[in-house]
C-alpha cells in the first residue's frame, strides 16, 4: 500500500509518496505540480509511473482554504481513497515527531507519514446540490455581516453632529443593495431545495424541530453534508465543537468547557437555534428551564440546548420522522461550560 502526502498551495502543491509497508517510512518519491486541471492530470500519470494504483493508495491532504478541492475531487473521481484532514492535526503530529525546519517538501513528507501512521478516514464529497447550498449559505452569512456593519455605521452617522449628507446617502444605498442581495440569496437557496426532493424532505424534517428556521436548517444541512457521515449525536457534537473538554491536572480541580474544536459555523447556528428554542412552547424550552432551575448559568444551559438540538435534528433526519415532543426528556444531559 502507498500513502501520498500532499502539501497544498494556491498555485502549486508538493507531493511525497511513501510505501506504507516500509517500517522506516524513509525515502519516497517527491515532486511538485501546478494546482490546476493540467497539474492534476500530471499527478495521476506520476502516480501510475510509481506503481501507486488507486485501489491501494491513500491520499492525504490538508483542508487549506478552497485550494485542496480541485485535486481532491480529481483523485476521488479516479478511485483513490482521499482523506482531507484538519491542518491542526498535521501541526500537532509534526510537533510530536520533534520535526526541525519547515518547507513545502518537508510538510508533504509529514502529511504522508501522518497518513501511514494514523490512517485517517476517507473523505466523501458532498453531492453537487449540497455544495451549491453551502456556497449560498456562506455568501449569505458574509452579506449579513456587511449589512450589520453598514447599519451600525448609519446609526452612528445619524447621531453625529452635522453628518455629511453624501456619506449618509451612500451608506443608505449600500444597505439597500445588501438587502436586495440577501433576498436574492434566500430565493436561490429555496430554489435549490425545491429542485431536490430528498433535500426538501430533510429541510422540512429539520424545521419541524423548534428553533430551526429555514436559514438555520439550511446551514446545518450544508455544513454537515446532510449528516451523510455522522452516525451519532456524540459525533455531531464533536464535529460542531460542542462536546465537553474536561480540564484537570494533579490537585487542580477538574472543570469542563466545550472543546470549540470543530466547525464554527455549525456551532454558531446551533447556539442561535437554541436561543430561538427557548422562546417556543416545547419540551426543549422545558429542558433549558430545567437546567436553569438546577443552578446552571444561562450560557451553559444554552450550550447544552444547542448540543441537544443538533442531536434531535440528526435523529429526525435519519429516522425520516418529524420532531415529536414526546421524545424530549427535560431531565437528561449534563452540560459543559462554554
Feature names for model-found ranges:
Residues 1-338:
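A detector of single, family-specific signature residues
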Amino acid at each position: 500500500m502507498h500513502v501520498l502526502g500532499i502539501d497544498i498551495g494556491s498555485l502549486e502543491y508538493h507531493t511525497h509518496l511513501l510505501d506504507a509497508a516500509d517500517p522506516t517510512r524513509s525515502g519516497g518519491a517527491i515532486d511538485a505540480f501546478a494546482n490546476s486541471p493540467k497539474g492534476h492530470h500530471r499527478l495521476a500519470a506520476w502516480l501510475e509511473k510509481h506503481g501507486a494504483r488507486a485501489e491501494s493508495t491513500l491520499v492525504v491532504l490538508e483542508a487549506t482554504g478552497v485550494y485542496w478541492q480541485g485535486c481532491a475531487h480529481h483523485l476521488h473521481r479516479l478511485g483513490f481513497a482521499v482523506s482531507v484532514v484538519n491542518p491542526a492535526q498535521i501541526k500537532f503530529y509534526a510537533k510530536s515527531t520533534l520535526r526541525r525546519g519547515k518547507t513545502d517538501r518537508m510538510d508533504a513528507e509529514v502529511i504522508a507519514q501522518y497518513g501511514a501512521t494514523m490512517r485517517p478516514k476517507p473523505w466523501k464529497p458532498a453531492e453537487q446540490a449540497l455544495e451549491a447550498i453551502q456556497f449560498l449559505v456562506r455568501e449569505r452569512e458574509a452579506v449579513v455581516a456587511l449589512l450589520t456593519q453598514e447599519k451600525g455605521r448609519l446609526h452612528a452617522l445619524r447621531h453625529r453632529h452635522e453628518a455629511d449628507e453624501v456619506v449618509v446617502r451612500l451608506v443608505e444605498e449600500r444597505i439597500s443593495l445588501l438587502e436586495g442581495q440577501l433576498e436574492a440569496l434566500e430565493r436561490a437557496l429555496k430554489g435549490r431545495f425545491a429542485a431536490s426532493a430528498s433535500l426538501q424532505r430533510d429541510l422540512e424534517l429539520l424545521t419541524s424541530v423548534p428553533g430551526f428556521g429555514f436559514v438555520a436548517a439550511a446551514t446545518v444541512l450544508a455544513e454537515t453534508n446532510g449528516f451523510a457521515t455522522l452516525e451519532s449525536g456524540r459525533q455531531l457534537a464533536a464535529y460542531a465543537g460542542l462536546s465537553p473538554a474536561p480540564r484537570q491536572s494533579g490537585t487542580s480541580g477538574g472543570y469542563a468547557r466545550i472543546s470549540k474544536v470543530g466547525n464554527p459555523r455549525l456551532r454558531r447556528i446551533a447556539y442561535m437555534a437554541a436561543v430561538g428554542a427557548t422562546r417556543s412552547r416545547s419540551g426543549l424550552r422545558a429542558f433549558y428551564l430545567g437546567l436553569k432551575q438546577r443552578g446552571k448559568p444561562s450560557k451553559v444551559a444554552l450550550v447544552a440546548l444547542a448540543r441537544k438540538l443538533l442531536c434531535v435534528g440528526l435523529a429526525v433526519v435519519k429516522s425520516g420522522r418529524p420532531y415529536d415532543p414526546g421524545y424530549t426528556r427535560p431531565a437528561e444531559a449534563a452540560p459543559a461550560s462554554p
